[in-house]
Regions:
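Conserved, mostly hydrophobic/aromatic
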Residues: 3, 31, 35, 43, ...
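Acidic (Asp/Glu)-rich catalytic clusters
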Residues: 32, 59-68, 94-100, 179-182, ...
């Protein structure tokens, strides 16, 4: 099974957001050594929960300290930006790391409404115009001409080069699936946002509506899943308590730093909170490396995914690194890494 990584640069209680950014850089090198195929960075703004506000900047830093792993955005929230500027950013990234850049594109704001307005006063209108933004961006990134009579048809995105980034469509609903299918792009469903609700439907719609493109003659699907592995089931459950408490806040619309297991244990849980946490746990992929890898493989088969991207969070960065290691080992990625090194 091909595995990738999504990193949101999660903020932890007792640590600064700046430390979370530096931990992202460390984790990228760690995951490359483990044999993961891609390392994707999220985009969120004005958030106390996640620090990753500029994936394109983090991508450049990771490109400078890695050699094999593909590096991508998951995603660039396109309504905030000019399609030309995004094309230029990703052409620069492609020049830095040729053949290793993924350009994941999303429509969601990754923020509250006021912050989205601060980023782009016309964000609401731009969100309704995403297909046109994607059309222009793909043309500028690939060097293809814009549509006839386009006012910017004579503008080229620089720097041009022999390779171009690989564009991806991202989403957690049928809308993103339709956009990806229309433009002939690989598609990644954000399973971790919906706890899997709508996943199979969106992927089936994507495959049914897919229009082959020159670069991608056939559909290709990834599913991004939250998962956590530890050396024992008991330790995995202890670490998961942080996620459970954080999710209770998120479900109320309050985005806070990830608490520690000790903070979760000390929390005065109400009956309603415990009931909600039990429902969340029933859907969560948590356990030993072998248990998690088995669940991920089963999920990929169930929804028809070609690969799985793993979002793993823990209050202790060492536990998060261990989670990715245990999953990689159980999935056989270490053997793939040795084979790559031998080549």
């Amino acid at each position: 099974m091909r595995l990738a990584v999504l990193d949101q640069s999660t903020v932890l209680t007792g640590r600064t957001p700046a430390e979370s950014i530096r931990e992202t850089l460390d984790l990228a090198r760690h995951c490359e050594a483990l044999g993961y195929s891609r390392y994707w960075l999220a985009e969120h703004h004005n958030s106390d929960a996640v620090a990753g506000a500029a994936p394109e900047v983090l991508m450049a830093a990771i490109a400078a300290t890695t050699t094999r792993i593909r590096i991508g955005s998951a995603g660039i929230m396109l309504p905030h930006y000019s399609a030309l500027k995004v094309a230029e950013q990703f052409r620069v990234l492609e020049a830095i790391a040729p053949g290793r850049i993924d350009m994941g594109l999303g429509r969601a704001p990754g923020s509250d409404g006021l912050t989205a307005h601060a980023l782009n006063p016309n964000a609401a209108t731009a969100a309704d115009n995403v297909p046109a933004l994607v059309r222009d961006l793909l043309a500028w990134v690939s060097g293809a001409p814009l549509v006839e009579r386009h006012p910017f048809r004579d503008i080229r995105a620089q720097p041009e080069g022999p390779t171009v980034p690989e564009a991806w469509g991202l989403g957690s609903s049928n809308y993103g699936a339709q956009v990806a299918a229309h433009f002939g792009l690989p598609y990644c469903f954000a399973h971790f946002i919906t706890d899997g609700l709508g996943c199979a439907e969106a992927i089936a719609m994507y495959r049914d509506l897919y229009k082959p493109s020159e670069r991608h003659p056939a559909p290709y699907v990834s599913v991004c899943v939250w998962a956590l592995a530890a050396e024992s089931e008991d330790e995995a459950e202890r670490l998961y308590s942080s996620r459970a408490l954080w999710r209770l806040s998120r479900d109320r619309g309050v985005f806070v730093p990830t608490p520690s297991p000790e903070e979760a244990a000390a929390h005065p849980w109400t009956d309603a909170e415990r009931a909600r946490a039990e429902k969340l746990r029933a859907r969560a992929i948590v356990g030993t490396g072998a248990q998690v890898a088995e669940r991920l493989t089963a999920l990929a088969l169930e929804v028809g995914a070609d690969e799985v991207a793993v979002l793993s969070t823990a209050h202790d960065p060492r536990a998060r690194r261990a989670s990715y290691r245990l999953i990689a080992e159980a999935a056989g990625l270490a053997h793939e890494r040795v084979a790559i090194a031998a080549e």
